[in-house]
Amino acid sequence: PHAALSSQSRGRQTEEAPCSVRTCYQRDRDRIIHSKSFRRLKYKTQVLLLPEGDHYRTRLTHTLEVSQIARTISRALLLNEDLTEAIALGHDLGHTPFGHMGEKVLDSLAKEHGLGGFHHAAQSLRVVDHLEKDGKGLNLTWEVRMGIIQHSKGQVDVRSGFGLAEPSTLEAWVVRISDSVAYLNHDLDDALRAGIVSDPDIPESVIKKMGASHAQRINSLIMDIIENSEESRPTFSPSMLASIETLRGFLYGSVYRHANAQIEDSRVEHVLAALFRYRVEKCKDDPQ
């Protein structure tokens, strides 16, 4: 009863004739999949910024994992799976190269040059609204656009027009929580593969609550969401939230702040700063 219905969508910025075989959310999903920005996600790394190997996550594989997790939860909760999928596939279209370190560097540089800052959720909306299709944008529905801008808990540029509001649909809530399920698990999996940590390092309380394998942990988190979600929003149980905080603390202490990660962070800062300042100078010479 709380699913967002395509027939009740608030529509698009530019009105279009309906499609005879696809709902408006299905069309949004397809437009995102066929966009250039979606294809570019395969070149953007996650935690390991310069990985050596074929099996580490990229922003594209992360997006696909979020989509799968979100669709499963949405289906179980009788929500609109098409809307959920569209939001999930579009949520990181504006993310930077080099993971969140890249976002941090660009945010600092943008503020330094009086541009207000940078947030990947706001940039994702800018991508679908203004950058795709040679500036025409994808003309997505209001619900998908809102889900994209509100998928993150971080500070969102108020110039996006959406401020810091919480997700406006349950489907958007599902994507937000699925994003956490995906990154917590694949960041740990990538760290194990890279030898940054080993299985005995994982906190015992996390193994006891979530499971010993990657598949078990994802399944435990998904089932916990399905079994504990309220009518107002999808959520975790208190005991699972405590375990998530333990895992997040472990990742920050042992993976994100690992010595090799710190070295890569300094390289990222140097590269992005040089590229940013080059573009600023080019804009001064040629405002067009």
Question: Which residue stretches match the model-derived regions?
Answer:
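Short active-site segment of divalent metal-dependent hydrolases/proteases
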Residues: 90, 94-98, 182
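A glycine- and small-aliphatic-rich helix-loop capping segment at beta-alpha/alpha-beta transitions
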Residues: 99-112
